[in-house]
Amino acid sequence: MKQKILLLSFLFLSLIGHAQPIDWNKKLPADPNVLIGITYYLRHNEEPKDRASFFIIRNAGALLENDDQDGLAHFLEHMAFNGSKNFPGNSMISTLERHGISFGGNLNAYTVYNISDVPMADESLTDTCLLILHDWSYYLTLDPKDIDEERGVITEEWRTRNTSATRIYNQKRPILYKGSKYAERDVIGNLDVIRTFKPETLRDFYHKWYRTDLEAIAIVGDFDIKNMEGKIKKVFSSIPVIPNPEPRPFFEIPSHDKTYFCLATDKEATSSNVQVIRIFRDKEYDGKGYATYQDVKNGLMIGFYNSMVGERIGEIIQRGQAPYVK
């Protein structure tokens, strides 16, 4: 880890020393292609050879839920594998597994739905992966029977996640995100909502926020860019653009002058933990990522700082001179 940090630092400083002077306040260049409301990113990378990864990235999630929808963004992640326009039932999983793409390994969903390490020699498999992204974008079936079956799956997931670490985090969350909607959402959601919501509530949430102007397609790997771009235009041009969509709200964690603190305990906790958390705020951050070159520099420097502190604490532990173990 130390070698990687030093290498990154050297490269970054070398660029500063040998390149033209950098205008740190300059806006970062936009680099998307936009097709009928869908943003897509294509990058050629020869390693690993003849392989690629396919992503659909959502700018939507739990923060957009109303109280009666608490947990539905996470629920939709599960439903992505329970039937769509071109892949009824569990056929999406079985189709990919025939090609060695495993569910949970190469096939996943969170804010980003992805299929990774796809062999590119088989042209039909490429077309299949694009069709899956197409269905994820707008065409999930959301069958009431499948929804009811998934309620139990998510209830069990909640039970297995209900550890001392989770309970301690839930005590800290109102302090960490005080005054923000982040304090109100824990992604997996409210079990009462999960058990009782109506299927149309899930469909309404899906079609309101999971739409083309709030998503992007990203494909990275060893393939011909022009050929892939043509395939994307052919597959995704049929997805309708939502007229007059509701603007996507963004949520900030309010600044505060005084230091907040929290003492969180749980009877099943097996160790004690002390954390110091700082919020670094980019001046022009708009909720969409880094805005300027200075933002990128700040992000790198914060990362270097955190890594250096971790390395030094680790060295103290190795020498047996610390009252802590990690």
Regions found by a protein language model. Give the residues of each.
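Hydrophobic h-region of N-terminal signal peptides that target proteins for export
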Residues: F10-H18
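His/Glu-based metal-binding/catalytic segments typifying zinc-dependent metallopeptidases
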Residues: E46, E246-R312
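Active-site-adjacent, His/Asp/Glu-enriched structural segments that form or flank metal-binding
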Residues: R58-I168, K181, R185, V193-T196, ...
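Histidine-acidic residue clusters that define the catalytic metal-binding segment
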Residues: P21-N33, Y113, E123, Q171-E215, ...
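Extracytoplasmic
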Residues: K27-P29, L35-G37, K49-S53, I57, ...
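An aromatic/glycine/proline-enriched structural segment found at the starts
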Residues: P21, A216-N273
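A structural supersecondary motif
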Residues: A62, G100-S102, I277, N306-K326
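Active/ligand-binding-proximal structured segments within catalytic/core domains
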Residues: E47-T95, V276, G287-V309
